[in-house]
């Protein structure tokens, strides 16, 4: 999609900014007619190079002639007239000063890009604001419902007190009336009738109050059920999905504190209802009648309250931090036998009456059917302390939690050797950790159980990349915690899903994810030239099948590049110096129109162990197609000896009998090499220790420096005019410095 086309899709306020860029000196109609051609030219170079600007000026006139011819074929007289007029204006204004025209076009294109970037930021901010507003409104609505539930139960509490007072008064008046009837003098029949009418009226009030309270409790339980369903089926499910994404590098998981507040309020409300029902039962025992609404409804309401409370408590027991080895904090859910790992469970309800001696017990593969149904499925024992008392010290907010910090896995060895006949390889075999505890309260015991996300168990650290690939694939596609047979028939992933997860792998360990161009190249690697968001990638294509004609698959290649970035290229990647994922064809298209010495950095597509290279462009002396030179890729072995910025600073090419020259001048598109990498160059070291302490003229060893030198035949360098000839003595000395391999290389030229 051309830049000009993107601009035309913007809102009117941004289009107005585009209108202000163009006037009669360079009319917008030329920008419209020659949009793609204009965007492909290097106007920045032409803006300071008269010769290059002159060529581009005449090229532009030729393009207008071609456009005029197309309009002639269409018999479009008006557009023909406009083209001729525009061409004359350009000739009048810039024939003698083509650099000025190049400067105008360069600035216009540059300002267009700024407008696009501003529009994109504006749209993202708008989308973010909308999403945040929707989320905030949703939270406010739920918070209001939870608070309303709390208010309702307080109102019922007051109603029960009123009922108790009314019942006490009724009981007192009944007894008083009975005592008076039993006295010797008795009471007048008229007074007795009046008292009975009053007592009957009080009874009706008492009966109505009981019915009213029962009705309000029933309605409150209806509200609680709806609110609780939202908490359990929406909010908690969303949190668990966010946790899955966070485990595989996605945005950090949201805090559980808000959920805990809601869960706790609802739980306290249900506990209060249980107490209120007990109070109603006490009032019933003191005074009952037919039909008593308390007698009729108490068991149903009590059972319903208990079921809601049980459901809430059982759902509130979660794995707050998934199993993870401290040695690999950014790759949870992959566990190595014999290596300690940690896991943390938490109860999202703060109940003061809870038994603080509640123990959590951890099990491995409890009730896992695959142990019996999948051939070759491995079995493991948990070593270390796998039980712990839940306490509030494990959490800063007073919630009950238990973190098991010193767990290890050991494989159960069966008699004989393990066969490899099973359908799953080790890193596709999924296991799970489950946690059990009990909530004990007077007259109430609730069994709680929760399960971790599936884990992969490896026995060698070399299996970690493959195990992590399984974790990525599962958590990208599945929300079920116990689908341990997933890899018996793994589903395909949409490219739109996988591309996001791939970008997370970089953004989670660096400050920069993958941009659209980098993802486009990776998409083509997996899906071919017609890669799109709806493209389907099989599991085998992702990490089992060799890519193209290479002897390695896609994921191991990505993983080794990630390691290379983390260990040797982190600052350069964070600064955006590394283009990284770009095909050779795209690389040449970008460099073709750049000034000589322009280079870019990309990752090697042919190195399984992860490597980076640079390619630079040279102008051909005969005016033909430019020449491109790519250096042999650098792996972690070379980068452990010399940093990549120092390699770029000191890199030399050498042709026979010429002084070596550094061909790298500008980081694409036009950033001075020293400006881009200067802050990462190694600083001069202090003078080393003297060779001979008794000789004051000796200041120390002669310092050496490792540099990268490429020896090439003079015919491969198109800029040999810039290389100064060396004398035989100079050439011999340089050969000695470079190394003994130089003579053997020269003898083959």
Swiss-Prot record:
UniProt xrefs under PROSITE patterns: SH2 (PS50001)
Any Pfam family hit: STAT_bind
ADP-ribosyl glutamic acid modification, residue list: 657, 705
Gene3D superfamilies: EF-hand, SH2 domain, signal transducer and activator of transcription 1, STAT transcription factor, all-alpha domain, STAT transcription factor, DNA-binding domain, STAT transcription factor, N-terminal domain
Residues flagged as site, Required for recruitment of EP300/p300: 724
Keyword field: Acetylation, Activator, ADP-ribosylation, Coiled coil, Cytoplasm, DNA-binding, Isopeptide bond, Methylation, Nucleus, Phosphoprotein, SH2 domain, Transcription, Transcription regulation, Ubl conjugation
Any coiled-coil regions, as ranges: 136-317
Modified positions (N6-methyllysine) in chain numbering: 114, 175, 296, 366, 525, 637, 665
GO molecular function term, any single one: DNA-binding transcription factor activity
Function description: Signal transducer and transcription activator that mediates cellular responses to interferons (IFNs), cytokine KITLG/SCF and other cytokines and other growth factors. Following type I IFN (IFN-alpha and IFN-beta) binding to cell surface receptors, signaling via protein kinases leads to activation of Jak kinases (TYK2 and JAK1) and to tyrosine phosphorylation of STAT1 and STAT2. The phosphorylated STATs dimerize and associate with ISGF3G/IRF-9 to form a complex termed ISGF3 transcription factor, that enters the nucleus.
Protein name: Signal transducer and activator of transcription 1
Protein's organism: Mus musculus
Organism taxonomic ancestry: Eukaryota, Metazoa, Chordata, Craniata, Vertebrata
Name of the gene encoding the protein in the UniProt record: Stat1
